[in-house]
Amino acid sequence: MAKEALPSIYDYTLDELKEILKPSFRAKQVYNWLYKKYASSYDEMKNLPKELVEDLKENYPIDIMQIVKKEQSRDGSIKYLFKLRDNHTVEAVLLLMKDKKIDEDGQIVRSEKYTVCISSQVGCKVGCSFCLTAKGGFVRNLTVGEYIAQIVNIKRDNDIAENKALNIVYMGMGEPLDNFDNFTKAVEIFSELDGLAISRRRQTVSTSGIATKIKKLGEKDLQIQLAISLHAVDDELRSELIPMNKAYNIASIIQAVKAFPVDTRKKVMFEYLVIKDKNDSIEAAKKLVSLLNGIQAKVNLIYFNPYPGTSYQRPQEKDMLKFKDFLNQKGVICTIRESKGLDISAACGQLKEKEANGNS
């Protein structure tokens, strides 16, 4: 079998590795090197016998993803372009947030909080009219290992301590629920205590609204957070923005969300990309309040981030504030997402497009 076709070491849960590697305690040693020390080669794994190292090199590739380009924003955000074994590329973004907590002495402690937005597919089938990723069409699903390697590469590149809290958002290139089996297995591997130990409650899946898959995800009860890319309050506009809405309309999505098991401490996030003169009116806000009636919801308003060639425009700040204030007055928790990476190619597909066009 060609090396590029072999499963990666990152494709396996700890229990699966215990079945493969003998004696089974070797699996935990390998996991420790992969996810606690972020080893980039088997030669670094000094407590493994030479025969095992050679077997791992031959049959379980570790170097499945390379950083080919990255851009750092003034706000600390970093956009990554990764090259895969078949030379396709995907993007991920490290978002750096400022966190403020009160310690046991009542003192304010300031720290940094990390969120990583990762991709699920090379390209995308959904074809959203506002998204640059759609321009390239769909190529393939990411493997389980390619999900995992995005986080490992970013933690290694930024020397993020193994015990540093980190949030994962499945909101990069592609539709995660269209890659259901690989996505859900990645959730499992990310959360393994002997591995990266990223709590499932720190993982959020963002979907364009495949109602049947939302139902299926709810039945698995993975205890992850759900975010819906809604972006419109009527089917006509949503079908323009997200053509898949013709198959899964707003009513079917809302029905699936109402059946989704939600942690009582959390809410279902509804992402609403605000586009000037498209969906930024108070009339739209009124319809949104009505749609979300009976749902434990939070609305996250997002400024449209323009890219070359799009006809859509960024909304005015005053209209965003009016929209937010109206929802809050009606009892719907609403925030405006802090824009990150405005001075870099932070929107999905932008860095990939720049690299393809040979731009620096």
From Swiss-Prot:
Q: Does the keyword Cytoplasm apply?
A: yes
Q: What class of enzyme is it?
A: transferase
Compartment(s) where it occurs, according to its Swiss-Prot or TrEMBL record = Cytoplasm
Binding site residues for S-adenosyl-L-methionine: 174-175, 206, 229-231, 305
- Keyword RNA-binding included in the entry's annotation: no
Q: Which reaction does it catalyse?
A: adenosine(2503) in 23S rRNA + 2 reduced [2Fe-2S]-[ferredoxin] + 2 S-adenosyl-L-methionine = 2-methyladenosine(2503) in 23S rRNA + 5'-deoxyadenosine + L-methionine + 2 oxidized [2Fe-2S]-[ferredoxin] + S-adenosyl-L-homocysteine; adenosine(37) in tRNA + 2 reduced [2Fe-2S]-[ferredoxin] + 2 S-adenosyl-L-methionine = 2-methyladenosine(37) in tRNA + 5'-deoxyadenosine + L-methionine + 2 oxidized [2Fe-2S]-[ferredoxin] + S-adenosyl-L-homocysteine
Instruction: Describe cofactor binding as the record notes it.
Output: Binds 1 [4Fe-4S] cluster. The cluster is coordinated with 3 cysteines and an exchangeable S-adenosyl-L-methionine.
Give the EC number(s) under which this enzyme is classified. Answer: 2.1.1.192
Disulphide bridges, residue numbers: 117-348
Residues that bind [4Fe-4S] cluster, according to the entry? 124, 128, 131
Q: Which family does it belong to?
A: Belongs to the radical SAM superfamily. RlmN family.
What function is annotated for this protein?
Answer: Specifically methylates position 2 of adenine 2503 in 23S rRNA and position 2 of adenine 37 in tRNAs. m2A2503 modification seems to play a crucial role in the proofreading step occurring at the peptidyl transferase center and thus would serve to optimize ribosomal fidelity.
Q: What is this protein called?
A: Dual-specificity RNA methyltransferase RlmN
The species is Aliarcobacter butzleri (strain RM4018) (Arcobacter butzleri)
Q: What is the lineage of its organism?
A: Bacteria, Pseudomonadati, Campylobacterota, Epsilonproteobacteria, Campylobacterales
